[in-house]
Amino acid sequence: MTSTPQPSRPSSLDAEIAARLKRSADGLVPAIAQQYDTGEVLMLGWMDDEALHRTLTTGRCTYWSRSRGEYWVKGDTSGHVQYVKSVALDCDADTVLVKVDQVGAACHTGAHTCFDADVLLKDGDSGVPAADQ
């Protein structure tokens, strides 16, 4: 990730915040949505500068759809709204953590979280094959 390329879409994001962001080659940063009161990770979306600006100023999560090439506000179609409680950058300024109050399902499958269907390692499992322990 690099901080030099600017997104091709116009943005009203505060210049100081924009200068700190390290974006992918296509001008995006991953945005993790986390339930503010439980800490449960809900989903991963993508934001460009304008999506982050809209998220910071409207109190609702706005993402950039890589497949559709357009902005989408979580819940506008489904009713499964994400109300923003806080927004933070990670230590490298290449990922955004958005703590939200999720109404309904976060996942497009209808599940509350996108991270519950394909668990690769569970609590209590060491992750090390039995022969190697």
From Swiss-Prot:
This is Phosphoribosyl-AMP cyclohydrolase. Pathway: Amino-acid biosynthesis; L-histidine biosynthesis; L-histidine from 5-phospho-alpha-D-ribose 1-diphosphate: step 3/9. Binds 1 Mg(2+) ion per subunit. Catalyzes the hydrolysis of the adenine ring of phosphoribosyl-AMP. Keywords: Amino-acid biosynthesis, Cytoplasm, Histidine biosynthesis, Hydrolase, Magnesium, Metal-binding, Zinc. GO terms for molecular function: magnesium ion binding; phosphoribosyl-AMP cyclohydrolase activity; zinc ion binding. Its EC number is 3.5.4.19. It catalyses: 1-(5-phospho-beta-D-ribosyl)-5'-AMP + H2O = 1-(5-phospho-beta-D-ribosyl)-5-[(5-phospho-beta-D-ribosylamino)methylideneamino]imidazole-4-carboxamide. Gene3D superfamilies: Phosphoribosyl-AMP cyclohydrolase. Belongs to the PRA-CH family. HAMAP family: HisI. Homodimer. It comes from the Bacteria. PANTHER family: HISTIDINE BIOSYNTHESIS BIFUNCTIONAL PROTEIN, PHOSPHORIBOSYL-AMP CYCLOHYDROLASE. Its cofactor is Mg(2+); Zn(2+). InterPro entries: PRA-CH, PRib_AMP_CycHydrolase_dom, PRib_AMP_CycHydrolase_sf. It is found in: Cytoplasm. It comes from Streptomyces avermitilis (strain ATCC 31267 / DSM 46492 / JCM 5070 / NBRC 14893 / NCIMB 12804 / NRRL 8165 / MA-4680). Zn(2+) binds at C91, C107, C114. Mg(2+) binds at D90, D92, D94. One of its GO terms (cellular component) is cytoplasm. GO terms for biological process: L-histidine biosynthetic process.
